[in-house]
Amino acid sequence: MKKLFGILCVLAAAVLAGCTPSNNEPQDEAKIGYDGGVFVLCEGTFSAGNSSLYHYHPERKEVTANVFNKANNAKLGDTAQSLYMYNGLLFVVVNNSGVVFALDRTTGEVKGMFDNLVSPRFVAIDGTGTKGYISQMYTSEVVTFDPRTLQRTGSITLEGIAGSEQMVVWGDKLFIASWSNDHKITVLNTNTDQQIATFEVGVQPYSMVLDKNDTLWVVCDGGNEYSQLPEGVTMEAPSLWKISAETHEATKVFDFEAGGWFRSRLAINGSGDTLYFIYDAVWAIDIATGNLPAEPLITIEGYGQYGIGIDPVSEDIYIADAKDYASNGEVLRYSSEGELIDTFEVGLMPSKFAFFAE
C-alpha cells in the first residue's frame, strides 16, 4: 500500500508539472477492461500536452479513446514517443514530459513511473526479465531499472555517443541506435552493462528490428540541413542496413533516393520472416530473398502515414495516418495480402502500436 501511495504521489507531482487533471473527460461508471487487441499511441502536438492512448479490439470493432485519462483521471502528457509491452505491463514513453509510465495493460492504471528523464525515447528489457533500459535523446546516459519492482537502478554512460534511440535485445547483447546527429550503433553486454562494441552505419540510424535469422535491420534517415553531424560525416540519402547480430558486419545496404524519407519505423511480423516499412508506400521484404520488391504491397493516398504495426498473430497490418497533423488521425487495418479490412478514428498524430499478443 505504501508503495502504491508513493507511485500515486509521484504521478500527482507529474500532473501538477504539466499533465493537468482531465476534468472535462467523462469517466465511465463501469470499470474499463482490455482483453486483447491493440493499443494506439497518439503523439499529439509538441508542447501542447495533448498526447493520448487509444485501444482497438478488432473482433468487436470497439474503439476506446483516452485510455490513460479514464484510468488515472490525468492527461498522458506532452509528445508521446513509444510503447513497449512486457509481462502484463504496457510501458508508455512520453518524450517532452520526461516520463515513462508502466500501466496495467488490462486496466490502463499506472503501476509505476520513471520521471525527471532527459527526452526519453524507448524501453527495452533483457532476456532474463531482470533489467530494463530507457534510452534518452539528449544525453549519453541510458537509465536502468528493475522490471519486477519498477524501481530505477542506475544509469549507463555511453562512450562517444551523444544520445540514444531505439534498442534491440539479442541474447546478452543490447543494440542501441544513436539517431540524433550520429551514425553509430552501440552494443552493451546485458550481464555486465559494459559497452562491448560500437560500429558505424548510415547517418542517423533511428529504427531497428531483429528477424528470425538473427539479422539486425536498421533504417538510417540520412540527416537533414538541421543535423549537427560529427566532423567528417555529411548528410546522405536514406538507407536500410542488413547486419549480422553476431558479427556486427553489414551484409547488404539498400540506398534510397536523396531527399526521400521513411514515414515509419521498421516493423516485423510475428514469425520474423517479413519486414515492413513505409517509404512512399507500404513495402514488405521477404527475408528469405532479402530483396526490395518491384512494387509496394500497399499504396495509400496522401502524405499522413506516420507509423506501422503488425499483429504478431493475425499478421494484419496497421497503418497510422496522421492526416493533416492538426486534426484527429485514423488507423487503417489491412490483411497481410494488402487488402483493406477496416478503419477507425483515433487522436492527434497516431504513430505507435502495441499488441496484446506481444
Place the predicted regions along the sequence by residue.
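Positively charged n-region of N-terminal signal peptides that target proteins for export
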Residues: M1-L4
